Amino acid sequence: MLQMPSKQPISAGIVIVAAGRGERAGSSKEGPKQYRMIGGKPVIVHTLENFMTWEAATEIVVVIHPDDEALFARAFRHIISATPIETVHGGATRQQSVLAGLRYLKDKQISHVLIHDAVRPFFDHALLDRIAESLDAGAQAVLPAIPVTDTLKRADNAGTVLTTVSREHLYAAQTPQSFAFETILEAHEKAAASGRSDFTDDASIAEWLGIPVTIVEGTADNVKLTVKDDIAMADDKLSASLLPDVRTGNGYDVHQLVAGDGVTLCGVFIPHDQKLKGHSDADVALHALTDALLATCGAGDIGDHFPPSDPQWKGAASRIFIEHAARIVRERGGTIMNADVSLIAEAPKVGPHRDAMRAKLSDYLGIDIERCSVKATTNETIGFVGRREGIAAIATATVVYRGRK
């Protein structure tokens, strides 16, 4: 059933399809391609940030694979959003995943919906505004597309060219594909009920039901990241598009050693015959790194945010402090590029625990473990560290803030 043309500015729900496995992009320890890092952030974060800052977006639902809960949670640490963002699990096909997202939005107060591939991070607000104008003018289905410019050949199974195909009236479809909400929900429900699962995009489902699809001008940059080389080119593109605002922050901390059963360093507990004395868990490494992160944006130091005189922080895990500092950095437009911690202690030995410490830093900061460094040295029995009266830590954080085009 077709809706009447909209008379009010659109209220848009956003469905971001992110349940694919991305097998053509090859395997990676970062997971499927929507979670690969480009420009210091996962692909899906760049996509989300574009929608989060678009004023017509009122609800965002990300359709993820059931196995990707942890990957999305890790990526989500990069995101500061005033627009509600929820997740639902997708199905075995893109079509099933889109329907899951649409069903989630069914009870939301939205007039229209934009359905977008998570691995298309390079769309802009000008494109979204063109789509909104077309929807607001009464279009039931809007497809961003660009004219085909390559010469097209049809070949047989052996790879022999049979004919050259005319490019006239041919367009390459993009996303976000956008619709009056009830129209596309009904279309997807009918497709599911009929057993049809061979549609390659949402506009095809609208066409199947005879719903007119209006083309608006797409952009050449709005490409889908499909293979491994696409990811590398996207990373290069982002790196080259901005004049970077690179900042380095340093932090230093020291805690006294007293009799005990172990120390916590970089979030890892190490059995020992002493412990670190402090108001919180006394993780000297995380305290130094917290100060280093705060220094990159002039946000004071750990004592300003978590005063030792405040009883609520007594015995607190220092993970709270480091994640708070990382969140402030991201709120101010920063991307954490590197974290380096040097521990100065006679004992315990750090070497056997270094990889576990790096893994903790990677988890707390939401960055690749290769960007996390932990080193240790002794003080050659000199001074309070040499006398095993305390442990010191020096930390350096490198953060890139949003530059200028």
UniProtKB/Swiss-Prot annotation:
The record marks 167, 224 as: Positions MEP for the nucleophilic attack. In the N-terminal section; belongs to the IspD/TarI cytidylyltransferase family. IspD subfamily. It comes from Rhizobium johnstonii (strain DSM 114642 / LMG 32736 / 3841) (Rhizobium leguminosarum bv. viciae). GO terms for biological process: isopentenyl diphosphate biosynthetic process, methylerythritol 4-phosphate pathway; terpenoid biosynthetic process. 4-CDP-2-C-methyl-D-erythritol 2-phosphate binds at residues 253-255, 279-280, 301-303, 377-380, 384, 387. Bifunctional enzyme that catalyzes the formation of 4-diphosphocytidyl-2-C-methyl-D-erythritol from CTP and 2-C-methyl-D-erythritol 4-phosphate (MEP) (IspD), and catalyzes the conversion of 4-diphosphocytidyl-2-C-methyl-D-erythritol 2-phosphate (CDP-ME2P) to 2-C-methyl-D-erythritol 2,4-cyclodiphosphate (ME-CPP) with a corresponding release of cytidine 5-monophosphate (CMP) (IspF). Coiled coil: none annotated. Residues 247-405 are annotated as: 2-C-methyl-D-erythritol 2,4-cyclodiphosphate synthase. It catalyses: 2-C-methyl-D-erythritol 4-phosphate + CTP + H(+) = 4-CDP-2-C-methyl-D-erythritol + diphosphate; 4-CDP-2-C-methyl-D-erythritol 2-phosphate = 2-C-methyl-D-erythritol 2,4-cyclic diphosphate + CMP. The keyword Lyase applies. This is Bifunctional enzyme IspD/IspF. Gene3D superfamilies: 2-C-methyl-D-erythritol 2,4-cyclodiphosphate synthase (3.30.1330.50), Spore Coat Polysaccharide Biosynthesis Protein SpsA, Chain A (3.90.550.10). Its EC number is 2.7.7.60, 4.6.1.12. Pfam families: IspD, YgbB.
